[in-house]
Design a protein with these regions (language model features):
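Terminal low-complexity, poorly structured segments
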Residues: 6, 29, 75, 111, ...
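BTB/POZ-protein C-terminal extensions
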Residues: 24, 56, 80-84, 88-97, ...
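Canonical BTB/POZ domain core
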Residues: 9-120
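Peripheral membrane interaction modules
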Residues: 1-7
Length: 198
């Protein structure tokens, strides 16, 4: 976005966000800064829009911690994914959705990178399902490969019990059957090589 602070077309004053079903508050966020950092808000608070003069904006379909991290990113250019592997992966997923919805491509890329780095035995299956739902082929392939290569650890972490999506379950079963077929073919080649050896 080419606008800069001081541009007369930018709105003045703060906005309060009412977040989630409980309408928890994030107060005193500069509309001007939001418009400069995010094209979505530039349009929302643009000339002729009813939100331009609104003191409060409701954001019902997210949680306070994730939306606070999103607003903090817009205001400071710093990404906070929280503490702990599971929380970081969950927050990265939610922030990525917020970045897509609000058209913030750099944040979307940072979240995609964080997701790729957060694949562990405990997160592989939930991330696999999320990648399937979002249509993220790269993360999907990475998670499938991880589950195949670390099956024992994923199973021990409870990853299999977390599986909810039948399509993903079918894909994992297909991967397992492919691995069994490869093992059998390898064993057959080894046996044939032994028989052919003098």
């Amino acid at each position: 976005m080419k606008k800069m602070p001081g541009d007369a077309s930018l709105p003045h004053g703060p906005v309060t966000f009412l977040v989630g079903k409980e309408e928890q508050r994030i107060e005193h966020v500069s509309k001007n800064l939001l418009c400069v950092r995010c094209e979505y808000y530039g349009k929302m608070f643009g000339i002729g829009m009813k939100e331009r003069d609104a003191a409060e904006i409701t954001v019902p379909k997210t949680d306070l911690a994730s939306f606070t991290a999103f607003i903090d990113y817009l205001c400071t250019d710093q990404l906070d994914l929280g503490e702990g592997e599971g929380e970081q992966a969950r927050r990265a997923l939610v922030l990525r959705e917020l970045a897509q919805m609000h058209q913030v491509p750099r944040l979307e890329l940072l979240c995609a990178q964080a997701l790729q780095e957060s694949v562990t035995p405990a997160t592989a299956v939930p991330l696999l399902e999320a990648a399937h739902t979002m249509g993220d082929g790269r993360l999907l392939a990475q998670c499938r490969r991880y589950v195949a290569d670390h099956a024992v650890e994923v199973r021990a972490s409870g990853g299999v019990e977390q599986l909810r999506d039948l399509g993903v379950a079918k894909g994992l079963l297909g991967d397992a059957l492919d691995q069994v077929a490869e093992l059998k073919m390898g064993a057959a080649r080894t046996a044939a090589g032994r028989r052919a050896a003098p």
